[in-house]
């Protein structure tokens, strides 16, 4: 049992403290909401189609999309373009493509998951480019323009508003440079992609007027920039520096990971690279920049224990906080546009938890038919905690635990024009370890919130063991095929632990934290809501997906401006028997803390998943939202 003292009071004797005082808040875009992965298997149309159509991979993406609204907005998938199949050449030698597999996957991302792709212009599409080296530039321009116009013709330009477009991933590496680009042909390719984006039209035609093309930004070169042996990316920067106004890329993207798995390494590596680039090419300072692969260490499939437990979640949160600090510092990362995490992979046995993924994947080969079970890792919960941050943030603060170790504090607010805001969200992040003579850590936090009406607070914790499914699995002997009882035990440890919630009546109330007995590392999310904050809206798009016989994954969509004060969700079920008769409504999530919009329901061999489902939210004031629409599910 955790012994965290969390009091709303006044405390005279403290070992470390700060108050909100005259804190400066800055507009904070949520710049960390991208994930990515590379599909397994062959890199051709058949291989990529099979990989992205795999039910386990689709369930993996469905769970990632079931984080709180805004936690993940973009997904970057290598070789996604290979879903487009070359069909034939027309009489004038122009390629004709079959977009059916590409359309199916894009529809899945957009309509079911509400995710936007980061479309990397990389692939060979049946050999079109390798077989026509003299036509490559024209064919790339044609493919880019045709792909975008095809999507606009299907669904209108509004669907593409949040799409991102990027050049070939890490073109200097032989493993990716399937086209054998030279410095010259790579520049031709990038400029062809730029022309294709510029010529792709907005085909929405209203009132008979011919609309102007919509400008679409191009990101690149998605490079490692490791040394002089990476000429393709460096040459592109040279070109852009000479004539910035004609630079084909609008956002300079790079990859910098850690070495030993720390957030500091990721950020320092990014700072060093951008400082080097600006020293060589000072004209590029006007371009926004993005670290597409801001991961703790290279090699997603390499098994590492820290990637299984709370430590990876803490590292990801710390990475975000340190990038925010670097952005505010006015140095080489002042133009930071976004970072992305390459952790949307599907893990495999025997490394279910320890690979760089958001979810642990168990392939249950003993069932008929075989199926996949996915368990949320603490890093998944960490992304959900970050999604609750406000729209304005102070700089990161460090509060000493002892002479060598500090707690990182990031305070954010939303709403409220005349004061700090009607909504406050603060993340406290411990170090991974501290000295044996660590002073008992007391943390005094003054809310300093202009309270027009009643307010309430809620605290959630991410800590070892209690919010660590990996620990539960290890305690059970790490079975390859965890049974239903163990799977439920792991899922009960998925979410951040709800610690304490209650009302606040007094202006400048103080939060006191005594974390001396909490096992390190830990993260705490504190949210404070005014009663005047928008009430919970009805959950939308309730969806029921089959996992296996008598087991379903239930997810729904949140309204972006009404879930900041959410405490938990309730999932209700009304069974229908074989004769079509309905029982009473049952609260099937009784006893679960569900801060995120999903729930996996497995009633057991004697139960049934056939029937009706509905969901509602409960906020920190114990008020409920309207129920979602009722959805019927029938297992065939």
UniProtKB/Swiss-Prot annotation:
Its main location: other. It holds the Pfam family Glyco_hydro_39. Glycans are attached at residues 180, 268, 365, 448, 453, 483, 622. Disruption phenotype: RNAi-mediated knockdown results in dysregulated glycolysis and lipogenesis, and is pupal lethal. RNAi-mediated knockdown causes the incorrect acidification of lysosomes leading to dysfunctional lysosome-autophagosome fusion and consequently, blocks autophagy flux. RNAi-mediated knockdown results in a significant increase in the number and size of lysosomes in the brain. Expression levels of genes involved in glycolysis (Pfk, Tpi and Ldh) and lipogenesis (ACC) are increased. It is an enzyme of class 3 (hydrolase). It is found in: Lysosome. The active site is at 170 (proton donor), 293 (nucleophile). GO terms for cellular component: lysosome. It comes from the Eukaryota. One of its GO terms (molecular function) is L-iduronidase activity. Alpha-D-mannopyranose binds at residues 39, 43, 45, 300. InterPro entries: GH39_C, GH39_cat, Glyco_hydro_39, Glycoside_hydrolase_SF, Glycosyl_Hydrolase_39, Ig-like_fold. Its EC number is 3.2.1.76. Alpha-L-iduronate binds at residues 78, 169-170, 257, 293, 299, 342, 356. GO terms for biological process: carbohydrate metabolic process; heparan sulfate proteoglycan catabolic process. PANTHER family: ALPHA-L-IDURONIDASE (PTHR12631:SF8). Essential lysosomal hydrolase responsible for the degradation of glycosaminoglycans (GAG) such as heparan sulfate. Required for lysosome function and autophagy. Consequently, has an essential role in the development, maintenance and function of various cells, tissues, and organs, including the muscles and the central nervous system (CNS). This is Alpha-L-iduronidase. It comes from Drosophila melanogaster (Fruit fly).
């Amino acid at each position: 049992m955790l012994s965290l003292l969390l009091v709303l009071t006044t405390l005279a004797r403290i070992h470390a403290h700060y108050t909100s005082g005259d804190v400066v808040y800055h507009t904070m875009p949520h710049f960390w909401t991208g994930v990515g992965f590379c599909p397994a298997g062959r890199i051709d149309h058949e291989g990529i189609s099979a990989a992205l159509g795999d039910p386990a991979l689709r369930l993996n993406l469905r769970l990632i999309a079931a984080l709180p609204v805004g936690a993940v907005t973009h997904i970057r998938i290598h070789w996604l373009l290979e879903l487009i199949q070359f069909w034939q050449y027309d009489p004038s030698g122009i390629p004709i493509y079959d977009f059916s597999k590409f359309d199916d996957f894009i529809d899945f991302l957009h309509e079911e998951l509400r995710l936007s792709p980061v479309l990397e212009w990389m692939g060979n599409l049946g050999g079109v480019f390798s077989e026509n080296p003299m036509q490559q530039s024209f064919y790339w321009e044609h493919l880019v323009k045709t792909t975008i116009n095809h999507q606009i013709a299907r669904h209108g330009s509004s669907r593409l508003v949040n799409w991102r477009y990027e050049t070939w991933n890490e073109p200097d590496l032989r493993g990716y440079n399937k086209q054998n680009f030279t410095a010259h042909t790579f520049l031709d390719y990038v400029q062809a992609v730029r022309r294709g984006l510029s010529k792709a039209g907005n085909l929405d035609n209203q009132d008979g007027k011919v609309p102007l093309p919509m400008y679409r930004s191009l990101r690149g070169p998605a490079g490692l920039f490791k040394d002089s042996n990476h000429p393709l990316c460096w040459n592109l920067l040279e070109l852009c520096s000479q004539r910035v106004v004609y630079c084909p890329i609008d956002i300079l993207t790079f990859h910098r990971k850690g070495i030993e798995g720390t957030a500091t390494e990721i950020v320092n590596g990014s700072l060093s690279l951008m400082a080097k680039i600006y020293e060589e090419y000072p004209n590029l300072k006007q371009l926004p920049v993005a670290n597409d692969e801001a991961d703790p260490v290279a090699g997603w499939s390499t098994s590492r224990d820290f990637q299984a437990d709370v430590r990876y979640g803490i590292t990801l949160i710390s990475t975000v906080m340190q990038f925010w600090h670097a952005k505010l510092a006015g140095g080489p990362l002042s133009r930071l546009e976004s970072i992305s995490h390459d952790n949307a992979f599907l893990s495999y046995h025997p490394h279910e938890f320890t690979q760089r993924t958001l979810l642990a994947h168990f392939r249950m080969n003993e069932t008929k038919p075989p199926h996949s079970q996915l368990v949320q890792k603490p890093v998944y919960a960490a992304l959900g905690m970050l999604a609750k941050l406000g729209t304005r943030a102070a700089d990161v603060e460090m509060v000493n635990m002892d002479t060598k170790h500090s707690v990182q504090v990031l305070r954010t607010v939303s709403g409220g024009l005349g004061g700090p805001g009607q909504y406050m969200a603060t993340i406290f992040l411990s170090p991974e370890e501290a000295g044996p003579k660590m002073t008992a850590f007391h943390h005094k936090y003054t809310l300093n919130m202009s309270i027009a009406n009643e307010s309430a607070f809620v605290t959630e914790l991410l800590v070892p063991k209690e919010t660590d499914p990996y620990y539960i699995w290890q305690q059970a002997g790490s079975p390859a095929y965890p049974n239903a009882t163990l799977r439920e035990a792991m899922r009960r440890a998925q979410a951040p632990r709800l610690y304490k919630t209650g009302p606040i009546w007094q202006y400048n109330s103080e939060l006191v934290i005594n974390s001396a007995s909490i096992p390190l590392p830990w993260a705490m999310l504190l949210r404070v809501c005014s009663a005047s904050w928008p009430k919970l809206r009805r959950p939308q798009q309730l969806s029921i997906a089959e996992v296996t016989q008598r087991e379903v994954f239930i997810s729904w969509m949140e309204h972006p401006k009404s879930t900041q004060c959410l405490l938990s969700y309730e999932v209700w079920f009304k069974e229908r028997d074989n004769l079509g008769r309905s029982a009473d409504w049952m609260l099937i999530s009784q006893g679960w803390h569900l801060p995120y919009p999903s729930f996996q329901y497995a009633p057991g061999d004697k139960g049934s998943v056939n029937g009706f489902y509905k969901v509602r939210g409960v906020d920190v004031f114990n008020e409920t939202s309207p129920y979602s629409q009722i959805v019927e599910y029938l297992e065939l």
